Amino acid sequence: MPDAEQNDDRVLAARIAAQFQEGGSRLMCEFDLTIVDAEPGFVRFTLPVVPRLCHGGGVLSGQAILACMDTGMVFVMMSIDETSNATFTTVHLQTAFERGVPEHCGEVTFEARAMKTGWSLVFGQIDLLLPDGRRAASATTTYMWL
């Protein structure tokens, strides 16, 4: 990727992070999500796996995973709409859990992407990846522009 495109992607990632810190869910801001890559329609971010997000079985809770997947699509929507600050909402989020995320794995990566962008709806896919690259969960989602 040429340097100008890499710089544009870094600027987009920083803009999304700043906007989310300013107007996003306070709860999700406490998750310490870090956007590591962004381009229009795609955002990759990490989540530190810490004890407060895990349940007694020693794995990351499904509630935390779902919240991150929904937030990942928020990031994607922000990457698509760079100028108008349009509002949007979740219409549908369906998740499949494939394997547990061990409490002591460090951090995990989420990759969220728009699969089809329309005038009123955006269809998305979000994957949760373990540090070794194996997928732990995936979701499909539909968002609506308001």
Where are these regions (language model features)?
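Terminal targeting signals and extreme-terminal segments of soluble enzymes
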Residues: 1-146
